[in-house]
Swiss-Prot record:
Residues 32-42 have a biased composition (Basic and acidic residues). PANTHER family: MITOCHONDRIAL 28S RIBOSOMAL PROTEIN S21, SMALL RIBOSOMAL SUBUNIT PROTEIN BS21. Residues 43-58 have a biased composition (Basic residues). It comes from Lachnoclostridium phytofermentans (strain ATCC 700394 / DSM 18823 / ISDg). Gene3D superfamilies: Ribosomal protein S8 (1.20.5.1150). Belongs to the bacterial ribosomal protein bS21 family. The keyword Zinc does not apply. GO terms for molecular function: structural constituent of ribosome. The lineage of its organism: Bacteria, Bacillati, Bacillota, Clostridia, Lachnospirales. This is Small ribosomal subunit protein bS21.
Amino acid sequence: MSNVIVKENESLDSALRRFKRNCAKAGIQQEIRKREHYEKPSVKRKKKSEAARKRKFK
């Protein structure tokens, strides 16, 4: 969980911007998208091997 403590004399916009940046660094949005739908283990393995093949030929 990302926490942001609003500093004294800090605008809400800048605090929200810091919070969004922390969430992006933590990978929360990607994790939510990944877990949105169930993915069978065989499909996970297939995607993983395709990604490895793609990296190898790049």
